[in-house]
Amino acid sequence: MSDAPKSHGRLTISASLRPRELMGEPQVRGAWTANVVTLFPEAFPGIRGLSLTGRALAQGLWNLRTIPLRDFGIGRHRNVDDTPAGGGAGMVIRADVMDAALRDAGDSLPVIYMSPRGRPLTQARARALADGPGVTLICGRFEGVDQRVLDAHHVEEISIGDYVLTGGEIAAQVLIDATVRLIPRVLGNQDSLAEESFSIGNRGLLEAPQFTKPAQWEGREIPEVLLSGNHAAIHRWRASEAERLTKERRPDLWRAYEATHMDPAKDRQLSGASDQSRDHREHRKDHSDEPDRTA
């Protein structure tokens, strides 16, 4: 009788739980929830079902529910779109179809439509969403969604960049990832959030370069200061590098940082980078009318 493990007699070995199957797990009450209205529910969780976000999904730290738009289609063929009013190319998702899907999602969560004409997605917006109960995401297709249903449901439009995709599914996954990673316990080390790009701990600037072993590679060395053990010097170096990179690569952020020397959000119209200094600006405004007591 062979002592070989049973797996040796199998033709294939596969994981017991696949990313898509994670969505079949019972949802955890009170956990952050993403409802996704989409024509392609099989696209989720996608890469969100892997690595840290996938493990967090399996652990119930966040929930994911897809709402197939086709289920609410009209007629025998379950049509979800029609020709644009006023003429033009393409098709537009019908208001009545989208309304039915959003009603199925419920009205307890903010609704966001992933659209290139939306406000830029920022770290501050992702942080605000992570602090809330969740979000309902609309994944657009064709020429978009009938404006009337967006107005009726007070839908916020968010863009992930100045370019156009074939649909909103990838954009929705970007927003989910940017948000879920900020939920406590999702990342293995929450301290890693403190000094990354756009974070408050990094003054809203870009993150400094990172290095690891080996100390020498292809004639290139790790900066000596990072191996010195002098934590104050390392902090100064990283702060200096963050400023240098921001100035070179994101002049919009740098102008904002110079203007406030606190937070790049002062220059929101130029950068669209963050609105996390709003409270600071409002505080200064509230006190601007007070009499000068130093005179």
Identify the meaning behind each predicted range.
Residues 1-102, 227-255, 274:
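N-terminal nucleotide/polyanion-binding subdomain common to many enzyme families
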Residues 92-141, 146-147, 184:
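S-adenosyl-L-methionine/SAH cofactor-binding core of RNA-modifying enzymes
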Residues 198, 202-261:
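Long, charged alpha-helical interface segments
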Residues 35-37, 65-67, 110-112, 135-137, ...:
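Hydrophobic/aromatic beta-strand patches that form the interior of the parallel beta-sheet core
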Residues 145, 149-196, 200:
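Structured adenosyl-cofactor binding patch, chiefly the S-adenosyl-L-methionine
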Residues 249, 262-271:
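Oxyanion-binding "anion nests"
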Residues 51-56, 127-131, 152-153:
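Short, solvent-exposed amphipathic alpha-helical segments in soluble enzyme
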Residues 278-295:
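Long, low-complexity, intrinsically disordered segments
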